[in-house]
Amino acid sequence: MTSPRPFRFAVQAHVGPGAPIPTTAREFREMARRTEALGYSTLCVGDHYIDRGRITQYLAPLSALGVAAGATTTLRLGGRVFCVDYHVPAVLAKEMATLDLLSDGRVELGLGAGWNPVEYEAMGLTFHDAPQRVAKMVEVLGLLRAHFSGEELDVHGVHATAAGYIGLPLPVQRPHPPIMIGGGRKRVLSIAAREADIVSFANVPVIAIDDQGRTPHQVARERLGWVQAAAGDRFASLDIEASPYFLSITDDPTSAVDAVSKRFNAPPDIVLD
């Protein structure tokens, strides 16, 4: 019989329409301290430069997480997620190891293959097809682990290369900071199940999404089945993450269900499910 995993809540610090926007260093530090004081496990910062075509700037994740680390003592620090096409892999490895060292081992390292072609185009990057982007993510994950190992790097991949030096500094968390990979399709979730420490279910819907009329609960169960099958014996050690993008914290659940139901034209029983 496996022991239950601890149930944790994290905060994603968005800077965008309708979100509270820290406009000064003091405001951001205060937000981080408040997040810690309220008992949240992790403060996560995205790796985005524009939104879906809208000019929406986000805080640069590494700088923001460094400020949050200096303002707190126990709050974990999540990059959610670092797009592998936006960073030189060897540099990202060193930056994350440094952040883990200087935060006394509080980093959670989210890794993603990229998804927003508008953002790629705006930044002058080529948006390759999904198989190539996912293959690069897997190679970058291997390079990160090689850096964190303390052994001389000898990585010669199609998409990620680093060789002839020892990755320093080493992270405090051994063998490496917890790695999170998320997605909604079978291939990426299966990779996450085999390789990551945290598996994130992306975009679980609030209404039926296909011609089979599946509910969000049924979709989530299907994805969990993919993860269980791919993870095998390591499933019990995984953290499973979900992101409720539409969240209402209230003591009046009936009104909350009604609001979501109207917004998405979904029956109340589907929302409750």
Feature-to-residue mapping (PLM):
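Active-site-adjacent structural elements that line small-molecule/cofactor binding pockets in enzymes
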Residues: M1-D273
